[in-house]
Amino acid sequence: MPPKTRSGARRSGRRVVKKNVANGHAYIKSTFNNTIVSITDPNGAVISWASSGHVGFKGSRKSTPFAAQMAAESAARKAQEHGLKKVEVFVKGPGSGRETAIRSLQAAGLEVNSISDVTPQPHNGCRPPKRRRV
């Protein structure tokens, strides 16, 4: 019996569905080590995303404002291909790329309707990590 051969290469992964969304939400999670930008439709389905590491920065350079700017530009460009024009921005975290990411979303051509800070605040929950001594 002859060995089986594949007649064509199979692609793995999801098929890209072209959504046509005018309004959406932009979530910016800015930590001390990285910045992640996710752009969703009003229902919460992710249209595009980018992070400082995804854009090509490694190590301590991921935490810079410039890396956050590049990540936000990349996510905005992908979202605009799906027809996105207006976003509401939700910012979370204490990182250095918060304001830069918002500014670069505006510079990329997205109209920012509102900016909300959704950083979680504990009501004296978990014990924080020990103080750093340098």
From Swiss-Prot:
The keyword Magnesium does not apply. PROSITE patterns: RIBOSOMAL_S11 (PS00054). One of its GO terms (molecular function) is rRNA binding. It comes from the Bacteria. One of its GO terms (cellular component) is ribonucleoprotein complex. Located on the platform of the 30S subunit, it bridges several disparate RNA helices of the 16S rRNA. Forms part of the Shine-Dalgarno cleft in the 70S ribosome. Part of the 30S ribosomal subunit. Interacts with proteins S7 and S18. Binds to IF-3. Belongs to the universal ribosomal protein uS11 family. This is Small ribosomal subunit protein uS11. It comes from Corynebacterium kroppenstedtii (strain DSM 44385 / JCM 11950 / CIP 105744 / CCUG 35717). The gene is rpsK.
